[in-house]
Curated annotation (Swiss-Prot):
Known partners and oligomeric status: Part of the 50S ribosomal subunit.
GO MF annotations in UniProt: rRNA binding; structural constituent of ribosome
Protein name: Large ribosomal subunit protein uL22
Keywords of this entry: Ribonucleoprotein, Ribosomal protein, RNA-binding, rRNA-binding
GO terms of biological process kind: translation
Family as reported in the entry's similarity comment: Belongs to the universal ribosomal protein uL22 family.
Domain of life: Bacteria
Amino acid sequence: MEVKASARFVRIAPRKVRVVIDLVRGKSVNEALALLKFIPKRASEPVAKVIASAAANAEHNFSLNKDNLYIAKAYVDQGPTLKRYHPRQRGQAFPILKRTSHITVVVKEKEAK
């Protein structure tokens, strides 16, 4: 049973979120949440929220045990970019691109041996 959760339009660049997502992919939900508490990256908070949401969805909607869940898929897609301009010398303007991310996490129940 695959259970999915996503956070859209997170105001962090996808490149920065992917660093954090790569660390937790394939780990158990409890292990990933414990790991994310100690990662000194701004992206670790929204990633932890999405993982916790996916685990809560699995518990509430499908009556799965949170301890048996692992992160089967975790990926980040680029959202819309907010374009801003920074005024420069002689009437010039340099663009500032404020990038957004769509974070998606899919959790599965571990197979019983």
